[in-house]
Amino acid sequence: MSRSIKKGPFIDDHLMKKTLKAKEGKDNRPIKTWSRRSTILPEMIGFTYNVHNGRVFIPVYITENHVGYKLGEFAPTRTFKGHKGSVQKKIGK
């Protein structure tokens, strides 16, 4: 179920403050955040966010196509190592 339109998109206050501060200061450093649940807004376009995936920070550069998604969608938390392959039986005669 999606979020109610009358509530508006969710973004952590500290993340919005960091974004606005970087925007007015023309700061190009990545913004470090643990807030994977925050929605990407148009004000965030052009900035790089270091999003924590539980182990390391993943750099995410925000473009127009990212607006409306959550920051956590671009920093995967699980490492897929592949399915178990079929064991080839060697027939030697």
Curated annotation (Swiss-Prot):
One Pfam family here: Ribosomal_S19
GO cellular component: cytoplasm; small ribosomal subunit
Keyword terms of this UniProt record: Ribonucleoprotein, Ribosomal protein, RNA-binding, rRNA-binding
Protein name: Small ribosomal subunit protein uS19
Gene: rpsS
Function description: Protein S19 forms a complex with S13 that binds strongly to the 16S ribosomal RNA.
Domain of life: Bacteria
Organism: Helicobacter pylori (strain ATCC 700392 / 26695)
Annotated family: Belongs to the universal ribosomal protein uS19 family.
Source species taxonomy: Bacteria, Pseudomonadati, Campylobacterota, Epsilonproteobacteria, Campylobacterales
Gene Ontology terms: biological process: ribosomal small subunit assembly; translation
Parts of the chain that traverse the membrane: none
Molecular-function annotations in GO: rRNA binding; structural constituent of ribosome
NCBIfam families hit by this protein: rpsS_bact
InterPro entries (UniProt xref): Ribosomal_uS19 (IPR002222), Ribosomal_uS19_bac-type (IPR005732), Ribosomal_uS19_CS (IPR020934), Ribosomal_uS19_SF (IPR023575)
